[in-house]
């Protein structure tokens, strides 16, 4: 394989923008599948990339399956990413290992809420992208409008590389502004590409749009700028070099168009992927040297250097755990010995495979920059595998905290065993899915990023693991905090024969207003009134006290604790005595520091026909929502709001019924906010009643 020609790309989009259909067409044109299937299982088969039964049924892509294809002797690894906000970790994971991306947009809806989330993630990982305006055959299609939205909403320097030949039901092809040729897609499944001269009625428009394109590209190539200013013809090679330079520098987003469903424009998009998106050689990747104070190391695409690979996705295959890996340096070979830098455990590479959706191909070797999969390796998602001569870790992926929890109860003993297996598997493969046993109720609690996220795991428990479970009502992850300052001076004393316990801790607590931090401990002890070895014990005790607040039993956050005095006993003082003194001191001051309850506030985006805009406003207002913005774009309306998570349960059903199923919403965690007094009283009462019973 020529690794200079390798492309690792992702296809990212808002849900229902036609992303899986586009991937399906790419597989078809690259001869990986022999028939085209539609997504929602209309023909009883379902799209090839949506290989989980559940995905085929819902018509949404959940797991990012990796597929290897070849287009005109360019090897391409495609990671199919989910478009639903509840599966954000899948998207984050995929982007971590990509070199380039295709952002798919609906020609009518344009830039939607999830497109904005996906774009933000692409920017976080500095992923160069092309835009593909899909569904140009739809009523109301307007690729020019979408190009403008890419500028106004995503702040991308979006430049048209093509213009459509006809729109809506008259969409028959595209004009390539670089080559100045018209392309039509004919024959069964659009496999015959017909190149013709540009139709005379579109020539003027094409010339005008080409001028705009060349003006934009002049920023990326001096030779192009000079030729263009002098009114001379610019060679195609120079134009292509300028497009590639701008795209790789993240300063240009080339815009292509067509209709994946109607088989228009997909092959030209593949040409653009090979021409304008980066190879692994074009991207800088770094790792941290664990043996050298986590010093940053530049990794090189070189098969002769020690191996560094990242496990970015786990799946249950028919032969055991399947681990998807991206090789950043060196090679992976069958029988090779590697070390997991997180666990320091050595292991041997067994079966090495290349994936095609859910079919596998055994291979002997994977080179630098490639994406392959391993069977039977014990690891967690995000682990780094290295040659034993080095100890590197790829920087960890950004992992958001879960915002919703649910109790799950197995119906019988067999289901209990299967549920335990399922939970072990899910927590390994998804760092945003967490589980624990509530000590008081003895219930198993699962936590995740949203209702759909947890629903999918409940379904998977039933289908894949045959675990019949009952679920409780979704619970919100509340927090407690303080709004005032309070002093403490607490003595912990226990003398009942034998070794006693003694420790006194004094100081004060106050709100901590620091972005991204929830606790700070300041030691102002002088003169050894608390010996140095017991200071960490105090710190530990305060943190223990914060695990469960006294208002409603949720963790306490945003507190700064300062200790400035204390006392110890030469015999009775100990680590545990000062931990208990700190816990007592915390509780004493907490009641006086005006404690309050915080709730997760979500950023909610509603999109739907303008005729339902009033209904959308109404639904948000009923849920204590604060409208932060609204946009009317002809027949299409978008409303943004900040809404407490506790008000959003079951919202999708209510939204569907009040908009005839025509509106959709997405939400993501924004911040924690103080609950209103009425809700504060309600939560306190509920907590106290539970404790009494």
UniProtKB/Swiss-Prot annotation:
Query: Could you tell me which SMART domains the record lists for this protein?
Result: EFG_C (SM00838), EFG_IV (SM00889)
Provide the Gene Ontology terms for cellular component.
cytoplasm
One Pfam family matching this protein: GTP_EFTU_D2
For this UniProt record, the keywords arranged alphabetically read as follows:
Cytoplasm, Elongation factor, GTP-binding, Nucleotide-binding, Protein biosynthesis
Gene Ontology terms, MF aspect: GTP binding; GTPase activity; translation elongation factor activity
Does the entry feature the keyword Aminoacyl-tRNA synthetase, yes or no? no
**Binding residues annotated for GTP, in chain numbering:** 13-20, 80-84, 134-137
Cite the tr-type G domain residue spans from the record. 4-281
Subcellular localization is given as:
Cytoplasm
Q: Per the annotation, which location comes first and is thus the protein's main one?
A: cytoplasm
Question: What does the UniProt record say this protein does?
Answer: Catalyzes the GTP-dependent ribosomal translocation step during translation elongation. During this step, the ribosome changes from the pre-translocational (PRE) to the post-translocational (POST) state as the newly formed A-site-bound peptidyl-tRNA and P-site-bound deacylated tRNA move to the P and E sites, respectively. Catalyzes the coordinated movement of the two tRNA molecules, the mRNA and conformational changes in the ribosome.
Which family, according to UniProt?
Answer: Belongs to the TRAFAC class translation factor GTPase superfamily. Classic translation factor GTPase family. EF-G/EF-2 subfamily.
Protein name (record): Elongation factor G 1
Which species does the entry assign this protein to? Borrelia garinii subsp. bavariensis (strain ATCC BAA-2496 / DSM 23469 / PBi) (Borreliella bavariensis)
Gene name for this UniProt entry: fusA1
């Amino acid at each position: 394989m020529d690794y200079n020609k390798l492309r690792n790309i992702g296809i990212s989009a808002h849900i229902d923008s036609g992303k899986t259909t586009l991937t399906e067409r790419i597989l078809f044109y690259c001869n990986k599948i022999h028939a085209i299937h539609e997504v929602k299982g209309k023909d009883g088969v379902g799209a090839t990339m949506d290989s989980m039964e559940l995905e085929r049924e819902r018509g949404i892509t959940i797991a990012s399956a990796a597929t290897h294809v070849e287009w005109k002797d360019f090897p391409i690894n495609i990671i199919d990413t989910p478009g639903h906000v509840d599966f954000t970790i899948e998207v984050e994971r995929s982007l971590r290992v990509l070199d380039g991306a295709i952002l798919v947009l609906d020609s009518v809806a344009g830039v939607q809420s999830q497109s904005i989330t996906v774009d933000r993630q692409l920017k976080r990982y500095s992923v160069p992208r092309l835009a593909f305006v899909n569904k140009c055959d739809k009523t109301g299609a307007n690729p020019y409008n979408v190009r403008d939205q890419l500028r106004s909403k995503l702040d991308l320097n979006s430049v048209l590389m093509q213009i459509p030949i006809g729109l809506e039901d008259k969409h028959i092809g595209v004009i390539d502004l670089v080559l100045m040729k018209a392309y039509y897609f004919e024959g069964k499944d659009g496999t015959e590409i017909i190149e013709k001269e540009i139709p005379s009625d579109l020539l003027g428009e094409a010339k005008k749009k080409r001028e705009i394109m060349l003006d934009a590209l002049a920023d990326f190539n001096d030779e192009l700028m000079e030729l263009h200013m002098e009114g001379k013809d610019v060679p195609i090679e120079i134009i292509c070099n300028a497009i590639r330079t701008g795209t790789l520098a993240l300063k240009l987003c080339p815009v292509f168009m067509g209709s994946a469903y109607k088989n228009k424009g997909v092959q030209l998009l593949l040409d653009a992927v090979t021409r304008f998106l980066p190879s692994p050689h074009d991207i800088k990747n770094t790792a941290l040297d664990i043996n050298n104070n986590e010093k940053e190391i530049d990794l090189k695409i070189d098969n002769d250097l020690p191996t560094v690979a990242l496990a970015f996705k786990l799946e249950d295959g028919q032969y055991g755990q399947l681990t998807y890996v991206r090789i950043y340096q060196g090679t992976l070979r069958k029988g090779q010995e590697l070390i997991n830098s997180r666990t320091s455990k050595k292991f041997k590479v067994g079966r090495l495979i290349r994936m095609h959706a859910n079919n596998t191909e055994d291979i002997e070797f994977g080179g630098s920059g490639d994406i392959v999969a391993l069977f039977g390796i014990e690891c967690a998602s995000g682990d780094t595998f290295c040659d034993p001569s080095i100890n590197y870790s790829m920087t960890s992926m950004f992992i958001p905290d879960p915002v919703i929890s649910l109790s799950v109860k197995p119906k019988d003993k067999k289901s209990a065993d299967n549920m335990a297996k399922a939970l072990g598997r899910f927590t390994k493969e998804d760092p945003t899915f967490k589980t624990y046993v509530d000590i008081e109720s003895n219930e198993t609690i699962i936590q995740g990023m949203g209702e759909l996220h947890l629903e999918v795991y409940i379904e998977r428990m039933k289908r894949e693991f045959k675990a019949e479970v009952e679920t409780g009502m979704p619970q919100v992850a509340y927090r407690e905090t303080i709004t005032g300052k309070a002093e403490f001076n607490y003595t912990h004393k226990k003398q009942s024969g034998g070794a006693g316990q003694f420790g006194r801790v004094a100081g004060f607590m106050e709100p901590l207003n620091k972005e991204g931090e929830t606790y700070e401990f300041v030691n102002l002890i002088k003169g050894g009134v608390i010996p140095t070895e017991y200071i960490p014990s105090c710190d530990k005790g305060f943190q223990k006290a914060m695990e469960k607040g006294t208002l409603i039993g949720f963790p306490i956050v945003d507190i700064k604790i300062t200790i400035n005095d204390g006392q110890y006993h030469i015999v009775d003082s100990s680590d545990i005595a000062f931990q208990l003194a700190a816990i007592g001191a915390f509780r004493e001051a907490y009641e006086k520091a005006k404690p309050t309850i915080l709730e997760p506030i979500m950023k909610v985006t509603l999109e739907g026909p303008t005729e339902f805009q009033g209904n959308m406003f109404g639904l948000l207002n009923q849920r204590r929502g604060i409208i932060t913005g609204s946009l009317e774009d002809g027949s299409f309306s978008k409303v943004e709001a900040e809404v407490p998570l506790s008000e959003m349960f079951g919202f999708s059903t209510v939204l569907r019924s009040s908009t005839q199923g025509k509106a959709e919403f997405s939400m993501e965690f924004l911040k924690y906010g103080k609950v209103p007094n009425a809700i504060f009283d309600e939560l306190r009462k509920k907590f106290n009643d539970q404790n009494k019973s």
